[in-house]
């Protein structure tokens, strides 16, 4: 079985047996025997697509047509991950998608559901929190040329953030490098630029690991994609307002703003990172088209689309401060309340901090300096949800309202 060395930094010493593509990274060590998983073999579903021939040193993978490249995707059943898989397939890439045996909100999707949803990608069911199992499950299906990590903790709890946003993401990097990946795309978040929450600190810690690996190995590159708000995170009140209730916001509704981006547009931007050399070894903040919108403007838009007079409930932000203060105090006495306190801080953060680029010169969030991409608008999304509901856009454990 593969021996995987974990640390807060990717080690720079050790030995490795060469892979078909190039020597495996030095933080992975392979004995001379084949990798085997204890117990039953991995649960695997495949479209019977053969692995690609490895790209030679004289012909980097970016010189190959998409049809001759394989991209590893973890978090493939998540909100953005599914669209990334579909977009890569649409562009002709071979996709190796990692999924849990039960996925979706509250694990409602079976393995057969996942295989059908991601077809014709090759799907490997594995556990990204178990580095040895992940590598063993993926090893028979390499090599890969690039990897995309769309993993994210479900609710942002303290332990879960470090388990998923850092360690499981690190396991993805280790497995991808062991399979020969020359480029790694990380789906991060624009809010990490002002890290006050555990999941932000965990994501930043991995971003450091990624940059360190690129500095160690010049043949390896990365792209860190930091999107603004997703459409679904702004759609939770559509049905409430549609049913005649007021729109709820904090303060005067102008405390924060964002340039929301659709899942399709974000997936296309992530797919661009696979081949676009200009996006290599860069942190890439990205928002959707148009100007930044405050909660007040979002609410006004929704009432206009419904043809109704605006009705708002404005909640003082100080209420959240009081709740957080109480939960923080209780968490010191009762550690089981640690996540409840963290969830309160997450709600407070999103109620008051803009999902825009933080201008280092002014220390202020900047609409103008936040890059825009794509064609889908929040207004189009609201129109669709008014007609069809939030099917496929459920918030699950991210629900605030």
From Swiss-Prot:
Pfam family, one: NAD_binding_10
Assigned GO CC terms: chloroplast
The entry's keywords: Chlorophyll biosynthesis, Chloroplast, NADP, Oxidoreductase, Plastid, Transit peptide
EC number: 1.3.1.75
Top EC group: oxidoreductase
Protein name, UniProt field: Divinyl chlorophyllide a 8-vinyl-reductase, chloroplastic
Example of a GO biological process term: chlorophyll biosynthetic process
Involved pathway(s): Porphyrin-containing compound metabolism; chlorophyll biosynthesis
Keyword Chloroplast in annotation: yes
Extent of Polar residues compositional bias: 1-10
Region (Disordered) residue spans: 1-26
Reactions mediated catalytically: protochlorophyllide a + NADP(+) = 3,8-divinyl protochlorophyllide a + NADPH + H(+)
First and last residues of the transit peptide: 1-54
Top-level taxon of the source organism: Eukaryota
Function: Catalyzes the conversion of divinyl chlorophyllide to monovinyl chlorophyllide. Reduces the 8-vinyl group of the tetrapyrrole to an ethyl group using NADPH as the reductant. Can use (3,8-divinyl)-chlorophyllide a (DV-Chlidea) > (3,8-divinyl)-chlorophyll a (DV-Chla) > (3,8-divinyl)-protochlorophyllide a (DV-Pchlidea) > (3,8-divinyl)-magnesium-protoporphyrin IX monomethyl ester (DV-MPE) > (3,8-divinyl)-magnesium-protoporphyrin IX (DV-Mg-Proto) as substrates.
Chief site of localization: plastid
Species whose genome carries this gene: Zea mays
Subcellular location: Plastid, Chloroplast
UniProt GO MF annotations: 3,8-divinyl protochlorophyllide a 8-vinyl-reductase (NADPH) activity
């Amino acid at each position: 079985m593969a021996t995987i060395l974990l640390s807060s930094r990717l080690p720079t010493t050790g030995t490795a047996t060469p892979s078909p593509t190039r020597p495996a990274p030095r933080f992975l060590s392979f004995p001379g025997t084949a990798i085997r998983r204890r117990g039953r073999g991995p649960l695997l579903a495949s479209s019977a697509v053969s692995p690609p021939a490895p790209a030679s040193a004289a012909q980097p993978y970016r010189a190959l047509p998409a049809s001759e490249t394989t991209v590893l995707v973890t978090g493939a059943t998540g909100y953005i991950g599914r669209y990334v898989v579909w977009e890569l397939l649409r562009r002709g890439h071979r996709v190796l998608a990692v999924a849990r045996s039960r996925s979706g909100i509250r694990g409602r999707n079976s393995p057969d559901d996942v295989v059908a949803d991601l077809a014709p990608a090759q799907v490997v069911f594995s556990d990204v929190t178990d580095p040895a199992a992940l590598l063993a499950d993926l090893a028979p299906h390499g090599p890969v040329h690039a990897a995309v990590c769309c993993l994210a903790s479900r609710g942002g709890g303290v332990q879960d953030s470090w388990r998923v946003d850092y360690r499981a993401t690190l396991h993805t990097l280790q497995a991808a490098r062991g399979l020969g990946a020359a480029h790694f795309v990380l789906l991060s978040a624009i809010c990490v630029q002002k890290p006050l929450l555990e999941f932000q600190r965990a994501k930043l810690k991995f971003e450091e690991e990624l940059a360190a690996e690129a500095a160690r190995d010049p043949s390896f590159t990365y792209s860190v994609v930091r999107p603004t708000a997703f459409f679904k995170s702004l759609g939770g009140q559509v049905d409430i307002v549609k049913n005649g209730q007021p729109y709820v916001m904090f303060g005067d509704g102008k405390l924060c703003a964002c340039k929301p981006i659709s899942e399709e547009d974000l997936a296309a931007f992530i797919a661009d990172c696979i081949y676009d050399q200009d996006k290599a070894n860069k942190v890439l903040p990205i928002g959707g088209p148009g100007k930044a919108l405050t909660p007040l403007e979002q609410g006004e838009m929704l009432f206009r689309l419904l043809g109704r007079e605006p009705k708002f409930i404005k909640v003082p932000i100080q209420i959240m401060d009081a709740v957080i203060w109480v939960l923080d105090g209780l968490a010191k006495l009762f550690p089981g309340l640690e996540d409840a306190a963290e969830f309160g801080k997450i709600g407070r953060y999103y109620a008051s901090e803009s999902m825009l680029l933080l201008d280092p010169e002014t220390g202020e969030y900047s609409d103008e300096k936040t890059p825009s991409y794509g064609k889908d608008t929040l207004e189009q999304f609201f129109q669709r949800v008014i007609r069809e509901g939030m099917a496929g856009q459920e918030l699950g454990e991210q629900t605030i309202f």
